[in-house]
Amino acid sequence: MYELPDTVAIDVVLLPPGPIMDMAIGANRALLAGNPDGGIRLDRANCLPHISVAMLPAKSGDIPEINARVDRIARRCSPMAMTIDAVAKHRSSTGGTVSAFHILRAEILQLFHKTVMNAVKPYQAPPAGPAMFAGEASAPSVDCLLRFGKTSAYERYSPHITIGFGDLPEIIPGIDFPFRFEAAKAAVCHLGSHCTCRRVLAEFDLGPRTPAARGRAARR
């Protein structure tokens, strides 16, 4: 059974469908080809491509309540149409370039983000350093988690799928922007280094398609 630390770095996310995950993983491999020590190696098991909705440190004992709140929100929300419109890049706190698929901030996505943020905010716990994360985590990872509410939430929310460290070309063979898809699943994840999604703690379908909560125990 997967054991959580007393304080857990969590990320409430939207999971893209399989073809979009594969597209992100392929772009990540292109970055790693030029930077094998890039630090982020996306895959479908231990480092999921995702769209962050809310990040926070939370007590492990509060996670069942957080899961229940996210489940209620997810069941009131239909699957969301999304558009990747470009490759976005920014400088990390260590000076490297981070590339991502930028996603247009549709009104429904902004509302989902705001609703989830308001629902989980009461569970924010005092930070506990790198021990909150799955595996090793650097000081910039801790800082990214703790700054989310101030620098990346509400009016500053900028949805994206992080691809990795490096300068991803804005024109990628086989990918024509804008690229549209539908997100139909949400999840609560345990964060790893670089605020990657290392473990799925619970997963939910968007929309009232099942009578019971779809939260599941961690896969690993």
Model-based region annotation:
Residues 1-83, 89-92, 111-190, 199-220:
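Basic, often amphipathic N-terminal segments
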Residues 93-97:
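Acidic/polar active-site rim loop that often engages polyanionic ligands
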Residues 98-105:
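Short histidine-centered catalytic/ligand-binding loop motif
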Residues 108:
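Soluble or luminal CAZymes and related metallo-dependent hydrolases
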Residues 193:
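Extracellular glycan/ECM-engagement signal in secreted proteins
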